[in-house]
């Protein structure tokens, strides 16, 4: 359907043999997202960055065969994930909310920190997401709630998936917007008349943050690194005058504490280290002592 209406998506294929999988990866390159034909909450999914990881994961997942096909998708690094939550009636969008993930795409939407309204999306990105969402709603003749997840990188927009149901972010965007999306969706499904919300309601002078609650400290040998498997056990929603204010409220709400003396910085590669310099200087001005793993090893 997406090909027919001219909407882009990451390259993917349902494959039934190791030969087919290798041929597909030769075409798109690593990294790739590997998953069984149907998964829930990211279970049994994995991002493979090289041949060794691919073979190890496929042995754990299942035997690849015509009875057990594996879907392999191109994984786009350093892309932003954007969500469209909407209610449509007879294929026409009645109300919508576009939110952005703070983490790069690759973190399960149930674990990701989400901000609404979006604060760092290009105007053209938002415009294209609206247009594609209208196309999909019309093509599927949607009447009710739906959620579309997008990849956005340099105004290049790709559809990850479309779910014809209310998503976990529906209550969050409803509360931030003060528009009950579920009430609208219920009226649509019952065939009752629905009025489109006034566009002025979408002009907010505050920011909402949805953050996830984790239980890593209570689970022995739990991996705290977030990925495509959902690991959170709850979530909070907070509102602030800007992103920083709302994020701070959210982090405190899920149990993080503001450090008193030192801050450990785990910064990754050289570019990420350079990107962290300004934040480290700000922490230093506030009286904190930034510490790196290199510094810890030296002492």
Where are these regions (language model features)?
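Surface-exposed amphipathic alpha-helices with a cationic face
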Residues: 279-284
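Residue-level detector of conserved catalytic or cofactor/ligand-binding positions
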Residues: 291, 295-299
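Short, charged N-terminal beta->alpha structural module
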Residues: 274-278, 296
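Conserved N-proximal alpha/beta basic substrate-recognition cap immediately N-terminal to
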Residues: 1-8, 14-17, 23, 27
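ATP-dependent carboxylate activation and anion-phosphoryl transfer catalytic cores
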Residues: 1, 5-6, 28-31, 40-42, ...
């Amino acid at each position: 359907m997406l090909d027919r209406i001219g909407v882009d998506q990451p390259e993917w294929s349902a494959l039934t043999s190791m030969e087919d999988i290798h041929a597909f990866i030769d075409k798109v390159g690593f990294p790739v997202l590997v998953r069984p034909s149907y998964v829930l909450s990211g279970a049994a999914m994995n991002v493979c960055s090289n041949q060794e990881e691919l073979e190890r994961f496929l042995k754990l997942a299942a035997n690849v065969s015509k009875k057990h096909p594996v879907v392999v998708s191109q994984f786009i690094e350093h892309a932003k994930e954007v969500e469209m939550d909407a209610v449509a009636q007879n294929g026409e969008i009645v109300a919508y909310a576009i939110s952005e993930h703070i983490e790069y795409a690759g973190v399960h939407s149930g674990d990701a920190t989400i901000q609404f309204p979006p604060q760092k999306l290009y105007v053209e990105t938002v415009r294209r997401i609206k247009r594609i969402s209208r196309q999909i709603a019309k093509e599927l003749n949607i009447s009710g709630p739906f959620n579309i997840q997008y990849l956005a990188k340099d105004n290049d927009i790709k559809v990850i998936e479309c779910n014809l149901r209310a998503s976990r972010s529906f209550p969050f965007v409803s509360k931030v917007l003060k528009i009950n999306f579920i009430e609208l969706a219920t009226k649509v499904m019952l065939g009752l008349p629905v009025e489109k919300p006034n566009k002025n309601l979408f002009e907010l002078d505050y920011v909402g943050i949805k953050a996830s609650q984790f239980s890593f400290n209570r689970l022995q040998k739990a991996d705290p690194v977030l990925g495509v498997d959902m690991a959170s056990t709850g979530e909070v929603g907070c509102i602030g005058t800007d992103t920083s204010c709302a994020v701070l409220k959210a982090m405190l709400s899920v149990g993080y504490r503001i450090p008193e003396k030192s801050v450990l910085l785990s910064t990754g590669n050289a570019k990420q280290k350079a990107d962290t310099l300004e934040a480290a200087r700000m922490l230093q001005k506030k009286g904190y002592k930034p510490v790196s793993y290199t510094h810890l090893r030296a002492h």
